[in-house]
Amino acid sequence: MASIMDGERQFHIRTLPEDVGRYVILPGDPNRVPKIAQMLDDAVQVAQNREYNVYTGTLEGEKVTVCSTGIGGPSAAIAVEELIKCGADTFIRIGTSGGMDLKVSGGDLVIASAAVRGEGTTAEYLPVDYPAVADFLVVDALKRAAEFTSTNEIGNRYHIGVVHSKDSFYGEVEPENSPVKENINSRWKSYLECGCLTSEMECAAIFAVGIVRRARCGGVLTALWNVERSKAGLPDNITDDSSRAIRCAVDAIRILIKEDRDNF
């Protein structure tokens, strides 16, 4: 393994440095990668291994990569680590989530400014009292991009704030089946009282790697639904359409490319 790890081709994502752009979009689902890559110019698949499907094209003349991370913090952290080894330094996670705060409804976009570290991966990167925060410039670019596609209508809005990252999907959606359900429900209640916007599984790990490796990271999530709104008797949408989040991420990369050029 040492000889493979020391080589130029990355051990898990199987890319070479020349395969990867400075700017990277990180969906979780490998099947979503070709859809995102269609929004780039001249995109081609450069690697595929395990949960990692990797395409690279150009945007505004700059090389941009799309790489899936699979589900959860460990595989997401591996992807970011190896993409950084190939020269990437700017990452936008795009994914789906379950709404938490009552102002978030299904179909809304959530731009993550930070993530609750309710998972285990970040403990390998950050002290327990260090926050998993997104890069301000990436958050700002996502905000400006979201403004182009959003309205004040339910299911077509955007929000910026703290998201919840977890390890167990079913621990959240079916806590009654867990022997530690009291702890799960108590933490969930605390996160709701703190105004956490939505729950997902990768942002904290991606942000933590970015902090430690000095890379710029952010995330934009589609809220699929919000069970808390349903509990409160409020109207809610249910959707699996991630097209707005994809467009937001691509437009944010455009903004960052332009500003990086202007500030070079």
Feature-to-residue mapping (PLM):
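Short acidic/polar active-site loop segments enriched in Thr and Asp
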Residues: 89-90, 197, 216
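Flexible, glycine/charged-enriched surface loops at secondary-structure junctions
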Residues: 43-48, 150-162, 256-264
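Metabolite-binding pocket within alpha/beta catalytic cores that recognizes anionic/polar moieties
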Residues: 1-145
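Active-site rim beta-loop-alpha module in soluble metabolic enzymes
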Residues: 132-195
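Generic non-transmembrane alpha-helical segments
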Residues: 141-152, 209, 248-259
